[in-house]
Amino acid sequence: MAYTQQATNAALASTLRGNNPLVNDLANRRLYESAVEQCNAHDRRPKVNFLRSISEEQTLIATKAYPEFQITFYNTQNAVHSLAGGLRSLELEYLMMQIPYGSTTYDIGGNFAAHMFKGRDYVHCCMPNMDLRDVMRHNAQKDSIELYLSKLAQKKKVIPPYQKPCFDKYTDDPQSVVCSKPFQHCEGVSHCTDKVYAVALHSLYDIPADEFGAALLRRNVHVCYAAFHFSENLLLEDSYVSLDDIGAFFSREGDMLNFSFVAESTLNYTHSYSNVLKYVCKTYFPASSREVYMKEFLVTRVNTWFCKFSRLDTFVLYRGVYHRGVDKEQFYSAMEDAWHYKKTLAMMNSERILLEDSSSVNYWFPKMKDMVIVPLFDVSLQNEGKRLARKEVMVSKDFVYTVLNHIRTYQSKALTYANVLSFVESIRSRVIINGVTARSEWDVDKALLQSLSMTFFLQTKLAMLKDDLVVQKFQVHSKSLTEYVWDEITAAFHNCFPTIKERLINKKLITVSEKALEIKVPDLYVTFHDRLVKEYKSSVEMPVLDVKKSLEEAEVMYNALSEISILKDSDKFDVDVFSRMCNTLGVDPLVAAKVMVAVVSNESGLTLTFERPTEANVALALQPTITSKEEGSLKIVSSDVGESSIKEVVRKSEISMLGLTGNTVSDEFQRSTEIESLQQFHMVSTETIIRKQMHAMVYTGPLKVQQCKNYLDSLVASLSAAVSNLKKIIKDTAAIDLETKEKFGVYDVCLKKWLVKPLSKGHAWGVVMDSDYKCFVALLTYDGENIVCGETWRRVAVSSESLVYSDMGKIRAIRSVLKDGEPHISSAKVTLVDGVPGCGKTKEILSRVNFDEDLVLVPGKQAAEMIRRRANSSGLIVATKENVRTVDSFLMNYGRGPCQYKRLFLDEGLMLHPGCVNFLVGMSLCSEAFVYGDTQQIPYINRVATFPYPKHLSQLEVDAVETRRTTLRCPADITFFLNQKYEGQVMCTSSVTRSVSHEVIQGAAVMNPVSKPLKGKVITFTQSDKSLLLSRGYEDVHTVHEVQGETFEDVSLVRLTPTPVGIISKQSPHLLVSLSRHTRSIKYYTVVLDAVVSVLRDLECVSSYLLDMYKVDVSTQXQLQIESVYKGVNLFVAAPKTGDVSDMQYYYDKCLPGNSTILNEYDAVTMQIRENSLNVKDCVLDMSKSVPLPRESETTLKPVIRTAAEKPRKPGLLENLVAMIKRNFNSPELVGVVDIEDTASLVVDKFFDAYLIKEKKKPKNIPLLSRASLERWIEKQEKSTIGQLADFDFIDLPAVDQYRHMIKQQPKQRLDLSIQTEYPALQTIVYHSKKINALFGPVFSELTRQLLETIDSSRFMFYTRKTPTQIEEFFSDLDSNVPMDILELDISKYDKSQNEFHCAVEYEIWKRLGLDDFLAEVWKHGHRKTTLKDYTAGIKTCLWYQRKSGDVTTFIGNTIIIAACLSSMLPMERLIKGAFCGDDSILYFPKGTDFPDIQQGANLLWNFEAKLFRKRYGYFCGRYIIHHDRGCIVYYDPLKLISKLGAKHIKNREHLEEFRTSLCDVAGSLNNCAYYTHLNDAVGEVIKTAPLGSFVYRALVKYLCDKRLFQTLFLE
């Protein structure tokens, strides 16, 4: 074999040398035959005649681009753009080659004459006449046919047979060959083949990309082949791109893309740039809810791109994809229910294939491989103030780094622009090597070398400067760091320095502030791939203009949206709503857009009075308003007239000018010509006040002016809310809650008695309802104690807000000094005296004030009396009610006394609205004002719910700031704490060194004035703790906010709330205020270890030396961030089954020390036989039920594990009454001033915007009460329930406001130590009759189903009938490497805290979902004033509102209330994940998200004692949510599981087995020990004393998995 191969090789070599003549002849013959075969194959190719005259070089271009054709160049026609015109015929033939012969084909915008000449009778051309050029082209094609026929006639020839069918078809039915309609509206042909095709030759530009897929589907197109012109350079910011091969060019102006030929001026085509870019970049073109057209690029030839669009069935994709662990039928159902959302998500994910694969980008853009886009740095010395256009150029990446790497080696002196330019020119030019000219490796345009050199030079200069600064570690000596930088730049640019400096700052390459400098080396280039993605994203975000509107309106709207597009989250801006609102209100969209951008970026100098710049708010803010001024007169009476009362002012409608300016005329005081008296409020319609708009939707002017306008609007909003509530009460007196009836009063004029008697008398104003049932605001006068009523009055409503003319008087006074409707800002010098607690601010005021010519204003009445008392302590009366006043007194009585003072002293001024401070300075006409306050203590709190109070308006603008850093009150240890809060050294004069102590108490039950007396002043953090202490018998208890500014010798600070409180944190101003009220001692009594205990412990450990020095070092710690490596499903490692009962007992005792030693078997008996003192509301007790009936006690199994679990209790009068007091009585009253109806509507709007999918917000027309819904409800009921409905005829209902009451006999275990000191109350069940449930149960079940279907399930989970596996799947896509804030909202007394406002919110949600108005009204009356009857215990009482624990809407109602509460307070648009279940919730936000004061909002608006706290791990419904780099796993709380193993209600062994099965269902994830370490961390975060628990987790798995072993945990 080897020999044969050797001989063959030798013969081959001889042949190559030509030594063998026979072989030579054979080779020549073979070469001839190959040439013949090649020529024959070439002849078999389709023949194309190229008639137009082109150059030889262009001939090569056409031949190489289309080797599939045999092209004959006749060069018999001279024409413009000859190559492009000839190539168009080749392009058409190339497209038609891809289609099976004879298949029905649509030529979109095609040449029907060319198809007729080819005899293609199966082609239909859509040739719409979009402009005159199309008409001309259509006529030219007809002329070409006539010319062809005339030549045949001249030669006496007939139409060839292959053309005759097409010509016959055109003669008989021209519409079947060509139509004048766009392809989107084409009616098509009547007879089609099985598969229909389409071609589009340079016609895609005029078809909107979003309509293309649907248009193809309407014509049943199988595949569409298309060709269009494009250039990669269009993605640069150049306005001109040339196509040299065909002699054409693109020019771009915004979204307008023009295509023209260089030598032709008439052919100019205009297209949409964004539309063309969509065809280039998009992969999928949706056609329907099921089918989509997928684009695939074929080839690029002579500036023309060929692609095809293939029709795909997406149902095949989804039903063919295997999904692990999902039921097939359930998956189909879910896909069909939410198809639109899932389809859009799938399309978006697929569209990114091209954009994320750089190799694909390089393939379709071959010229762009290894090319980068470099900006050209413009350093023009002219037009410094004008904005210069940005320029870019595309060059080789290798060229860029060759230059940069070389010039980086230059020394500092050698690094000049000239040297850089010289080097760039040298490597670009031709060089001579050994006498031979060599071309440069990089072909860079020489016209760009100077600009490129400047970019390279500046980039290198900044980079070297930054490196030098890093090396020198920013050591600055005689000059500042900023001066060094500018010296370097000046040396580099010499006389060009001012322009360069301005350009560097404008482009933000160097950022300079007063004390800081930042150097940012810009990105040298961007890749073509990045630019393609950027252009594509910007194009798809560009809205489609309404072609039905005029061109001018479309251009304005486009410009407006372009302005808005720079804002964050601009993709969520609803263009349709914005356009509609602008048209309705007559607002220029471009003006609205510019205002919005300026306001959001805080560069406008104005403030919009809405919370967020939504579409409607922006349009409403800029709505043109017509203001009308009411003419008024000012009466001036003589100086001998005495001071008139406010009642006289109202009656006479005149204001005394006595003392207004004294007896002298002041030029500084300018009184408005429009003086408003309180009479203007008399008999004004309530609708006028309630609907009265704010001062302006847009606050303009300086910051002080904006603050004044916001303050005036806040007064109007407060008055509006008070009037709205009175109007509601006067129409429905039954709606007054017994808990709040003391705040209101309703007087019946006809009956001459109080229907609801108010607690106080002498109200200044109220709301009146006349005989026509219209409501007005009236200023009240009295005849003795009786109200003087008008003839038409029917009822008068008053409230605690109407006792005085507070808001009315302040509004009158402030409006009276407005100048042309604008606040007048005083030129007085305002000095802020910022002092630490106890620095002697009041003492300083008394020492500096001259009571003869100065004014002292304080926020509270007690503070004013204290200042007067201290000022007059010497016996000489110098401080009076004229020069020492409260702020409210000064504003309400403005004009009744002296109005001009020399100096103003404002104590605790930072607790006031900044606008109020500005008004006080201006109205006092002082020349200097001193505002005393503490910047670290509690600031002004906006107590009008839903009123906008922008953050930047909260900063008081002053002329000077003085600091007081020596405290006269605080001991040394508190001074040490103050040094951590204030700038500068805080000193003290107190002789007390140590003053703090704390005590952890067992629970609120131990607090008693006898057994636990509290020393000194008693202070609490929350109103609920204050109310509890007052009910226990403690006196003189106040909250921290109430005692700010006061001083006490000894303080007892008390916290009885075990759940986290938001205001108790180290950063909270409440903590600072609470610890700085004493001079001698403070003791903290708390039920939990919190931030206060941590601070006090630290202070107790501070050495005496440090207390003398008052020095604090604060270090900053940084978090190391590590990127994830792998993501997937949970890793499973089976847990070893080890451990014993003693392990579980040990773990329980370590977590809850002492609970296992509690002997509570006879607590219920002790409760019955001992004397009890209970705080009971109005109720009826049947004392015959006080002795429970004797019952046989059931025997239960005894648990081996000792926990705090109790035996089931027996219902009775005392037991049920204690449970009712705990669960239903003494509900909190924390709510502020709330306009219930308007605020509820606003809250529901936020609820729907936050949680519901936009497309599904509209209610469905589905009958809520039907036979099917009733049958579904009955299937879920027990047989006993159905038996109760046997005699129900569904015609009449029992009383819907009557409820039954019972208790759950098994006490609920709490995972804390309260069992050691408290007798836990049982849970109650308040429920309707089954007959009522039979009607409303199916209704709300259907409403709940509709609500859950519309919820955005990808981000929110409403935990209804969910399994632990479903919870894991919901949280599985959380990225553990993305920093997140995990928030939990804990609400105490959730059910009984719900009042009228909560009901209004819930009813509004049900109504919007489609609840019938009649059923809604019946349901509403059944939840307002309700009666509870407990037949077992003999108790009857009345409750207002509250959540009923056994209602048909209990669970879903609680869930939507907590969700609505959170959506009204938190930025839900930034939420990553959120879950809600009853009163439990867990939220995942991006790290660093700003949150408002949750406790304040929950108190004032929702009446909730809410605490929002952050955690590292989520805890939801008794389960720990552990998210890791692979996904998420949910572990059941192991401590809760052990607590259940101590249950004392297990009846027998069968019951025990059922108990074990239920525990296995919820705790199955404990069998996976792969994430035990994470579980240890999560448990340790909640329970500080918990040890590492891997051993007990394994023990739990061991006993739960073994049926026999589990039986040993309980004894007979």
From Swiss-Prot:
Domain named Alphavirus-like MT: residues: 72-280
E.C. code: 2.1.1.-, 2.7.7.-, 2.7.7.48, 3.6.4.13
Record's catalysed reaction(s): RNA(n) + a ribonucleoside 5'-triphosphate = RNA(n+1) + diphosphate; ATP + H2O = ADP + phosphate + H(+)
Binding site for ATP: 835-842
Keyword annotations of the record: ATP-binding, Helicase, Host-virus interaction, Hydrolase, Inhibition of host innate immune response by virus, Nucleotide-binding, Nucleotidyltransferase, RNA suppression of termination, RNA-directed RNA polymerase, Suppressor of RNA silencing, Transferase, Viral immunoevasion, Viral RNA replication
InterPro entries associated with the record: (+)RNA_virus_helicase_core_dom, Alphavirus-like_MT_dom, DNA/RNA_pol_sf, P-loop_NTPase, RNA-dep_RNA_pol_alsuvir, RNA-dir_pol_PSvirus, ToMV_Hel_N, Virgaviridae_RdRp
Note: This protein is translated as a fusion protein by episodic readthrough of a termination codon. When readthrough of the terminator codon TGA occurs between the codons for Gln-1117 and Gln-1119, this results in the addition of the RdRp region to the replicase.
Oligomeric and partner information: Heterodimer of a large and a small subunit.
Protein name: Replicase large subunit
